[in-house]
Regions:
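Intrinsically disordered, low-complexity terminal regions
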Residues: 1-268
Length: 268
């Protein structure tokens, strides 16, 4: 059992937590997998071991300097909030599903399983998957996404976003802008932006579809043998410090305007 101290905020405070989870039929090296705090005023949290038959890691709320989780063939599920520097690696068909992550550094990877985070507040994040989809809700900060054979979806991005997919689709809504760079080698890109967003725009793809409700100033369209390049400025800005660049050499880029309310997904 790892040392811990109870807090009245529904969190388990740890300086360093390492968890390894084997397959559902495999051996578990360490089983500190579920944490909940009952009562208030410094009452002790109850830490229970995961059920090896299910192969699932569940975290309710953690406040830590560093959290390291590694699983092979199981599931990592966070039902609440994780605070701190986070490092999660899920091998085989393992999935990672998290309600909220908040910290200075977040590193999450999966191989053939879904990577899903509802809220992400971080200074720097790197999320990757070999063959699973990456599905994010509201993200803030400097976010880097990598996928080899999966789709990337971001419901709302506020800050700097760099997303690269080898084969798949990218679907992103940009609410507030820093620098956004999207690229897919084999697939298409859908970019939705807030109607008032100001940015330099550069789109490059086999086909490009810019909706008429998007106001692009000084738009320049250049055709080439293998596609089209469109550049311009959104909403009468001439700054190059904030920009959106999208590249789909073998696919279609669709650019749309979308309200903040439309970006909300009113479902679980």
């Amino acid at each position: 059992m790892f040392p811990f101290s109870g807090r009245g905020l529904g969190c388990l405070r740890l300086c360093l937590l390492r968890v390894w989870a084997g397959e559902a039929t495999g051996r578990w090296a360490c089983g500190t997998c579920q944490s909940r705090l009952y009562g208030s005023g410094g009452s002790q949290p109850e830490v229970s071991r995961s059920d090896p038959a299910r192969g699932t890691l569940k975290e309710w709320a953690l406040l830590s300097q560093k959290l390291h989780v590694q699983t092979i063939g199981g599931k990592v599920i966070c039902l609440g909030t994780i605070y701190g520097n986070i490092d999660i690696h899920a091998s085989d068909k393992s999935t990672v599903t998290v309600d909220k992550l908040q910290g200075s550094s977040v590193n999450i990877s999966t191989e053939d399983g879904l990577l899903k985070v509802k809220y992400l507040y971080t200074e720097s994040s790197f999320l990757s998957s070999a063959a699973g989809d990456i599905t994010l809700g509201s993200v803030h900060g400097n976010i880097t996404l990598r996928s080899k054979m999966g789709n990337i979806t971001v419901d709302s991005s506020s800050g700097c976003l760099n997303a690269l997919a080898q084969q798949g689709a990218i679907d992103v809504y940009v609410s507030q802008l820093g620098k956004v760079e999207l690229k897919v080698h084999k697939g298409s890109i859908l970019v939705k932006v807030a109607s008032s967003l100001q940015a330099y725009l550069q789109l490059s793809g086999k086909e490009i579809d810019v909706n008429s409700d998007v106001h692009v100033e000084e738009m320049n369209e250049a055709h080439r043998d293998d596609g089209v390049i469109i550049t311009g400025f959104l909403n009468q800005t001439s700054e190059h410090e904030k920009w959106i660049k999208a590249d789909a050499p073998k696919g279609t880029i669709r650019f749309r305007s979308q309200s903040w309310f439309q970006s909300l997904k009113l479902q679980d």
